[in-house]
Swiss-Prot record:
It holds the Pfam family NUDIX. Belongs to the Nudix hydrolase family. RppH subfamily. This is RNA pyrophosphohydrolase. Its EC number is 3.6.1.-. A motif (Nudix box) lies at residues 38-59. NCBIfam families: PRK00714.1-3 (NF001936), PRK00714.1-4 (NF001937), PRK00714.1-5 (NF001938). PROSITE patterns: NUDIX, NUDIX_BOX. It comes from Francisella tularensis subsp. holarctica (strain LVS). The lineage of its organism: Bacteria, Pseudomonadati, Pseudomonadota, Gammaproteobacteria, Thiotrichales. PANTHER family: ADP-RIBOSE PYROPHOSPHATASE, DIHYDRONEOPTERIN TRIPHOSPHATE DIPHOSPHATASE.
Amino acid sequence: MIDKSGYRANVAIVLLNKQNRVFWGQRRNRTSWQFPQGGVATGETPLQAMYRELHEEIGLRPQDVEVIASTRDWYKYDIPDSLVRTKEPICIGQKQKWFLLKLKSPESYIDLDANDSPEFDNWRWVSYWYPINHVVYFKQEVYRKALTYFKEYIA
């Protein structure tokens, strides 16, 4: 779903383990790492999109996690000109609703091959603030906003 301004509606997931470390996934066939994320389909709520993406990208089901919080606002980022899609509808970036989840099931339930088109090749747990400086540069500010917003929910 791309809005009139050219931003694609998207959800992003910060998944915590019991030690409050976060899931960090390496994009398939790439060297870049990121949080699970994906588009919101027409007629889908952000919560529904989050659960769908959670299963598609890392194999987890709603019963495997607890939703701790979500951002009130949509956080936007622009993509570099070289990545802007030139055919209609033109997409200049993403607007994201972020979700903070706590893993309730064993980490062995994480399955990067739950989908026919896996998003990630590899994953690991990293410290809470690590992703801000290790995600692709044009996503750093939205990562900073989301992690800062969620910090108050972490015990």
